Structure formats: C-alpha cells, structure tokens
C-alpha cells in the first residue's frame, strides 16, 4: 500500500512543491529513500524508525520506500520526517486517516522539532488549496504570518 502527502523544499527563498510518497510492501525489511535525497533526508531513516517505536507504534517489518518527487530537485531538509512517519503508520494500518500538510523533523523520542523556510511553504500551501497544516509548536508564531490556514 502507498500514501502520498504534499510538502516542499526551498530553492533560495522559493518553496518548490514536493510529493512525499510512502510505500509499504511485502519483502525484505529494507528502508529506501529515493528522489535526490540529501544527507539530512537520508538520516531520516533512523529518526523516523526511532520516533515511531518511541511513540508506541510498530515500525513495519516489510519493504519500505519513500519517493520524494520530483526527482530532479535535490532535497536537503529534515521536515519530511513527519509525513514519512505518518505515511508508514497509514500504509501499515496503524492509523486510519490523515490529511493536510505535515511538516516537522522528528526527534528520536518522537518529539516534533521546528522547521525553517516556513512562510514561503505556507504561502505555497495556501495557493494550492491546502486548508490544514500540522507543524511544530515552535513554528506557530511564524505560521501566524500566513492567514487562511488552520494550524495544528
């Protein structure tokens, strides 16, 4: 099963749309991240695995693939952690639903850490019809600069 969430990466001060596609399928228990993922994104593997188990869920013991599209854009950010984790929980049947934009780096203990480049991302989200955004509490003041979205 696979799920997909909208997200972004920054090129200068411009937010570029990115789709975080998360797939879980039968096979060897490997975890791959594809789509020009930089070092901080590759390190998400350990943060996501630890955060899921620290939060009382089971990390899927199956083949796991995350595709960050478009592939031609290099991604050097850690805010894909949250949509990856939620995607794995949905795809493995541990959660039943989730929607909206989800942004945040995960600590090994499951704590949501703040992200950078938020205002251009939220403007992009609003332009694309997004209504709800899940983000770290530390980013709420900055998020308040962009009206028309509901923040959790």
Regions found by a protein language model. Name each.
Residues 1-152:
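Peripheral, non-AAA+ core regions of ATP-driven protein-machinery
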């Amino acid at each position: 099963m696979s799920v997909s969430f909208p997200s972004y990466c920054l090129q200068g001060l411009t937010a570029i749309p990115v789709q975080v596609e998360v797939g879980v399928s039968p096979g060897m228990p490997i975890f791959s991240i594809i789509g020009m993922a930089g070092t901080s994104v590759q390190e998400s593997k350990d943060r996501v695995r630890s955060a899921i188990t620290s939060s009382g869920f089971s990390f899927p013991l199956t083949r796991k693939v995350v595709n960050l599209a478009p592939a031609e854009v290099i991604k050097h950010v850690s805010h894909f952690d949250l949509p990856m984790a939620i995607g794995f929980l949905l795809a493995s049947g541990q959660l039943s639903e989730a929607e909206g934009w989800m942004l945040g780096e995960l600590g090994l203990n499951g704590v949501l850490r703040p992200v950078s480049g938020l205002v251009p991302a939220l403007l992009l989200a609003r332009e694309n019809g997004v209504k709800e955004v899940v983000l770290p509490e530390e980013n709420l003041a900055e998020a308040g600069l962009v009206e028309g979205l509901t923040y959790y």
